[in-house]
Design a protein with these regions (language model features):
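A charged, amphipathic alpha-helical module
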Residues: 1-31, 146, 150, 154-281
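Metallocofactor- and cofactor-centric catalytic cores in central/energy metabolism, strongly enriched
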Residues: 12-22, 26, 34-43, 62-66, ...
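Redox- and metal-dependent alpha/beta enzyme cores, enriched for Fe-S-associated oxidoreductases
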Residues: 27, 38-39, 44-56, 247-312, ...
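Short, charged, surface-exposed secondary-structure boundary motifs
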Residues: 61-70, 138-140, 275-283, 373-376
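Glycine-rich, highly charged phosphate/nucleotide-binding loops
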Residues: 69-87, 308-320
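Acidic/His-rich segments in extracytoplasmic proteins that coordinate ligands and/or metal ions
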Residues: 80-155
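TerminUS-proximal long segments
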Residues: 317-324, 329-331, 335-341, 346-401
Length: 401
């Protein structure tokens, strides 16, 4: 297929957290608020002149300093983020929205605050650490509303004069929903037998929507949607099998590129920094305040294995099965960041439950933060592709008989 018009520009935006569009927005007077986790409600970080930047540490080579302050058996994602912060890579931020979800990420942001990683002369800068409930009932919704109001909206309003009213929240939701509609429409094309977009390209599109100001990335996403609608696909399919990828943080699209180079087209992205969850519309009604509805939406749509209530576990398993069915995947790859506590449990359980209860063939892996060039991972994915092909062959032979 012909390369997407803006793909190379999008890739350049992913080379640095302080990318060109972030710099442009700040030059125009906007305020960047950093976050890492789905549980820090993204849409509430985009009120008024504020815009969210989901933190990444592209091109990480060493984590020695972060390992000194944390531990060599702590999550590599968290260590990479702390390392980049200590290098001064996030000095452009005006606030940092943390969450008390996983210990490693919590410790990373705590160290940022202790060592003043935000830089000097930032009296208005604030850190927050939201206490996230383990379930999604109305008591939990009330709790997270109080946390967000006190720890995010109040300092935004008092430190920077940001409008945090109900009308401002609804305006932010409207802009957020347009991003979601565009990415959903593009993503739906992956259900086709010969999609007009690859998993790698889609991962790049989703990532830039997380790390760039919405108002500046939206025109480029609109153009890309129009381009995908009319894109001519290759006559021959360029994949051998279709897979869903499920798991923890994938903020490096080169991992998706590696999987696809083995012949497995990634048709569903159910991982942190992917489109499931995070790129679905938030539907608001007029009968309740917007803040409560937004907080409820994030609690009810999280797919983090920290949510240990039984109905949440069932929800996650059912959703993966639904994605595999809807996107016509031949199997699923469950991946976890090395040393991730919650996903280590989820991945092991899924290794038993998904084949047994749902008939879904899976590959279960743990991986380093930078995995795009991993020879061992490539070998395992290649073997998985071959096993899926053998499964298809046996099924075809059974039908013939």
């Amino acid at each position: 297929m012909k390369e997407l018009k803006h793909l190379m520009y999008f890739e350049r935006l992913l080379d640095d957290a302080h990318n060109e569009l972030v710099r442009q927005a700040e030059a125009e007077g906007d305020l960047a608020i950093g976050y890492t986790c789905f549980h820090a409600p993204e849409v509430l970080l985009n009120l008024g002149s504020c815009f969210s930047v989901r933190l990444r540490a592209p091109h990480t080579t060493s984590m020695e300093l972060a390992t000194y302050y944390m531990a060599n058996n702590s999550c590599e994602f968290s260590r990479a983020i702390l390392e980049r912060a200590l290098e001064g890579g996030y000095g452009f931020l005006h606030a940092m929205a943390g969450v008390d979800v996983c210990e490693a990420n919590n410790r990373a942001i705590e160290n940022m605050e202790i060592m003043h990683a935000q830089g000097a002369d930032k009296d208005k800068f604030f850190y927050c650490n939201l206490d996230i409930p383990y379930s999604d009932d109305e008591d939990c919704v009330e709790h997270i509303c109080e946390q967000v109001s006190r720890k995010i909206l109040k300092p935004m309003r008092e430190n920077y004069g940001v409008d945090t009213s109900d009308a401002a929240i609804r305006a932010a939701v409207s802009e957020h929903n347009e991003v979601c509609r565009i990415l959903t429409e593009i993503g739906e094309t992956r259900k086709l037998d010969n999609p007009p977009i690859t998993g790698y390209e889609y991962a790049v599109l989703v990532l830039v929507s997380y790390v760039c100001p919405k108002r500046l990335i939206l025109p480029l996403l609109r153009e890309t949607l129009a381009e995908v609608k009319t894109r001519e696909v290759d006559a021959q399919k360029n994949y051998r099998v279709r897979v869903a990828v499920v798991g923890s943080e994938i903020d490096d699209p080169d991992l998706i590129r590696l999987i696809e180079s083995c012949g497995a087209l990634v048709v569903a992205d159910r991982y942190c920094y992917g489109s499931f969850p995070g790129r679905q519309e938030i539907v608001l009604t007029d009968g309740e305040d917007a803040l409560t509805q937004v907080c409820r939406w994030y609690l009810q749509h999280t797919e983090c294995p920290r949510q240990s209530a039984l109905h949440r576990v069932q929800y996650r398993n059912d959703h993966v099965a639904q994605l595999v069915h809807d996107f016509k995947a031949d199997g699923a790859i469950y991946e976890q960041m090395k040393f991730c506590t919650y996903w280590s449990y989820e991945r092991v359980i899924a290794n038993q439950v998904m084949p047994r209860d749902y008939g879904i063939h899976i590959l279960s892996i743990d991986r380093p933060y930078i995995a795009g060039q991993s020879g061992q991972l490539r070998t395992r994915v290649q073997a998985f592709v071959e096993s899926l092909e053998m499964k298809q062959l046996r099924a075809a032979q059974k039908e013939d008989n």
